[in-house]
Regions:
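Hydrophobic beta-strand scaffold residues
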Residues: 36, 81-82, 110, 141, ...
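Short beta-strand-to-turn element immediately C-terminal to the catalytic PLP-Schiff-base lysine
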Residues: 116, 154-159, 192-195, 266, ...
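Active-site nucleotide/adenylate-binding loops and adjacent lid/helix of ATP-dependent enzymes
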Residues: 1-8, 51, 92-186
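ATP-binding N-terminal substructure of ATP-dependent carboxylate-amine bond-forming enzymes
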Residues: 1-101, 105, 117-131, 306, ...
Length: 321
């Protein structure tokens, strides 16, 4: 058994979700017989890691500071193996602009988009280009922060009158925003496990919000707000295509260990589009990765054990090389 430093909480806007993920993971690690030191991440992180004398870190952080490569870079400096993707992959996944450009360049379909920084609006007059953007994307348009997760700051603009308010909301979460073509259809997710070279896709999950068309923060994390179907009721070809795109995105962004790929199945065309890749997906009681694993015959403890084993295997492989 290992001494595990469980990193949770932190100071991001997704702190509460991280605490919930961390609580679930801690219970599992203890059931598996590991010695767990739970660390609510803050300015004393390095001191607490050194005091813990851990063999491995289980990163259950979400949002800035934990999912954007910062903690991963620090753990690399300290020589402590950790779960999930490395700094570069985390940076690519966290910044949706970088991720979408990489996916598009690799031929992986993602909704058309334009991205601008706050400085572009303040210093370059980007607001004057909004009519041209709106004409190309057509309404409704999705406006969202470039970084972040859990659907925080995402707004739908049904008309030009809605765009300024949506931009203000998105800029309250980040200094860079994305304006994206809205894909109306079914909200799907494919979780992926394994090293970049030989990952495997888990059954597709479909999220069906009960009260709203949009799978927002409340729908994601409040029990009873969303119906989940896993495996999703899709034809074999669509399922295979969803798996193909998810694995392609996972490899293209350099993910390792585990990740979740969010997709939309467009109702009008039957086409699949990759929305984003989450380098550290939630592990709460309503999260999609545990549901997908369960549908594949992997209970939560086995899922946590595999994620931990992959972290140690990467360290062993690196040391051997």
């Amino acid at each position: 058994m290992s001494r595990v430093a469980l990193l949770k909480g932190g100071r991001s806007l997704e702190r509460q979700i991280s605490l919930r993920s961390g609580a679930q993971v801690q219970d599992s690690l203890e059931r598996l017989g590991h010695e767990v030191t739970a660390i609510d991440v803050g300015p004393d992180l390095v001191d607490r890691l050194e005091a813990a004398r851990a063999d491995v870190a289980f990163v259950a952080l979400h949002g800035r500071g934990g999912e954007d490569g910062t903690v991963q870079e620090l753990l690399d400096v300290l020589g402590l193996p950790y779960t999930g993707s490395g700094p570069a992959a985390c940076i690519r996944c966290m910044d949706k602009v970088i991720a979408k450009h990489a996916l598009r360049d690799a031929g992986i379909p993602t909704p058309d988009f334009y991205a601008f920084s706050e400085a572009a609006f303040n210093d370059l007059g980007a607001a004057r280009a909004l009519p041209a953007i709106e004409a190309r994307l057509e309404f409704p348009i999705v406006v969202k922060p470039a970084a972040g997760g859990s659907a925080l700051g995402i707004k739908f603009a049904a008309s030009a009158a809605d765009v300024p308010g949506a931009l203000v909301a998105a800029f309250s979460y980040d200094t860079k925003v994305i304006l994206e073509r809205h894909v109306a259809g079914r909200d799907l997710a494919v979780s992926v496990l394994g090293p970049a070279g030989t990952p495997r896709a888990l059954p597709v999950v479909e999220a069906i919000p009960r009260d709203e068309d949009f799978y927002d923060f409340e729908a994601r994390y409040e029990i009873g707000r969303t119906t989940f179907r896993c495996p999703a009721e899709l034809g074999e070809e669509v399922t295979a295509r969803a798996h193909e795109l998810a694995l392609g995105a996972y490899r293209e962004l350099g993910c390792y260990g585990f990740a979740r790929v969010d997709l939309m199945l467009e109702a009008a065309t039957g086409e699949l589009y990759v929305l984003e890749v989450n380098a550290i997906p939630g592990l709460t009681e309503t999260s999609l990765l545990p549901q997908a694993a369960d549908a594949a015959g992997i209970d939560f403890d086995a899922l946590v054990a595999e994620i931990l084993e992959l972290a140690l295997a990467r360290e062993t492989s690196t040391a051997a090389g």
